[in-house]
């Protein structure tokens, strides 16, 4: 599963809904294989920005480039082909399907022979089906999900469902992995377990990771750099230690409390 991360360049991005500006001329770059965290209070524009990157929203101005390729305006279903994978805040899984089946769906963009050949299991379609299942088993091993591989996702604990959501995004072998608050709703033990896997993904697989998170301690422990948004605008970016001490961050995101 080892791969190469892509360079993500966001420049002067603007997104509006009616008279409300959700993203205000935001610019930043995530270097190849960087673990870049994005933080900010609720309503800061973090999820809206992710929605622009993977094609759910189309911004009114600015550019988004992945290894120099402009991704704005491309059909949503082509984002996986470009190398963009995403785990949503709410896992967005198929609850009646097993873990294996959800991960196979996550690899849909990797199938080359077409639905007809794959569906009747012969020739090139059969070979691709075998390869897809082999790749899925590797992901199951990586995330230590073998006990749950044949369990319907809806029957799993919430923390395991969140892990399956990240695993399904990784099943695309993305160059850019978007994580939207993967720790939301998790207890401390589950958060620590997810942090362990984020480090493994970064170190052992190597996609570029853009990670929206509220847990500043986890961000400080894991992220290479941090971008801070407030009211749709970027107020600062830098390494975690500098971000924790930045007056603008303390005032806008954390109140007057020390971090």
Map each language-model feature to its residues.
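Conserved ABC ATPase "signature" region
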Residues: 116-148, 152, 196-200
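Conserved catalytic motifs of ABC-family nucleotide-binding domains
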Residues: 173
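Helix-to-loop junction immediately C-terminal to a conserved catalytic motif
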Residues: 54
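The feature captures the beta-strand-to-loop junction immediately N-terminal to the Walker
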Residues: 39-41
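Conserved structural motif at the start of ABC-family nucleotide-binding domains
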Residues: 8-10, 23
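Conserved ABC transporter NBD signature motif
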Residues: 62-69, 82
């Amino acid at each position: 599963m080892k791969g190469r991360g892509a360079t993500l360049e966001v420049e002067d991005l603007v997104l509006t809904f009616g008279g409300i500006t959700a993203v205000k001329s935001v610019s930043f770059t995530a270097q190849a294989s960087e673990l870049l965290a994005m933080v900010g209070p609720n309503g800061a524009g973090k999820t809206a920005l992710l929605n622009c990157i993977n094609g759910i929203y189309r911004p009114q101005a600015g550019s988004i480039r992945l290894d120099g390729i402009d991704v704005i305006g491309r059909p949503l279903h082509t984002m996986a082909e470009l190398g963009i994978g995403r785990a949503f805040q709410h896992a967005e899984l198929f609850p009646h399907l097993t873990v294996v089946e959800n991960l196979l769906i996550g690899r849909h963009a990797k199938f080359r022979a077409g639905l007809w050949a794959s569906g009747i299991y012969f020739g090139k379609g059969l070979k691709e089906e075998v390869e897809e299942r082999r790749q899925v088993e590797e992901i199951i091993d990586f995330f230590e999900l073998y006990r749950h591989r044949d369990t319907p996702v809806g029957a799993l604990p919430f923390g395991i469902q969140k892990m399956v959501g990240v695993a399904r995004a990784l099943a695309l072998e993305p160059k850019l992995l978007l994580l939207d608050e993967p720790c939301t709703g998790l207890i401390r033990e589950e958060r620590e377990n997810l942090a362990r896997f984020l480090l493994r993904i970064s170190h052992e697989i190597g996609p570029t990771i853009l990670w929206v998170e509220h847990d500043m301690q986890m961000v400080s422990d894991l992220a290479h750099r941090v971008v801070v948004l407030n009211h749709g605008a970027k107020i600062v970016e830098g390494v975690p230690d500098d971000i924790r001490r930045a007056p603008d961050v303390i005032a806008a995101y954390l109140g007057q409390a020390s971090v």
